[in-house]
Amino acid sequence: FSFKRLKGFAKKLWNSKLARKIRTKGLKYVKNFAKDMLSEGEEAPPAAEPPVEAPQ
């Protein structure tokens, strides 16, 4: 087990197409969420994108 290999694997994973897609989607979601919070105050986000909450 080597950290060097793990780092290389993580880098490969980070630069993969899937990861890039997830990152851009995540970034868009965060931006939209922040915009909604600023413009609408305490209103909940749309049901199409449920907020991520810890299970109770």
Swiss-Prot record:
List locations, semicolon-separated: Secreted; Target cell membrane
- Highest taxon listed in the record's lineage: Eukaryota
Q: Does the keyword section mention Heme?
A: no
Q: Which GO terms describe its molecular function?
A: toxin activity
Does Ion transport show up as a keyword for this record?
yes
Membrane spanning residue stretches: none
A GO BP entry: monoatomic ion transport
Query: Listed GO cellular component terms?
Result: extracellular region; membrane; other organism cell membrane
Tissue pattern of expression reads: Expressed by the venom gland.
What residue range is the signal peptide? none
Key words, A-Z:
Antibiotic, Antimicrobial, Cytolysis, Ion transport, Membrane, Secreted, Target cell membrane, Target membrane, Toxin, Transmembrane, Transport
What does this gene product do? Answer: Causes cytolysis by the formation of pores in the membrane. Causes rapid and reversible paralysis in crickets. Has antibacterial activity on the Gram-negative bacterium E.coli (NBRC 3972) (MIC=0.4-0.8 uM), and the Gram-positive bacteria S.aureus (NBRC 13276) (MIC=13-25 uM) and B.subtilis (NBRC 3009) (MIC=0.8-1.6 uM).
Family membership? Belongs to the non-disulfide-bridged peptide (NDBP) superfamily. Long chain multifunctional peptide (group 2) family.
Protein name, per record: Im-1
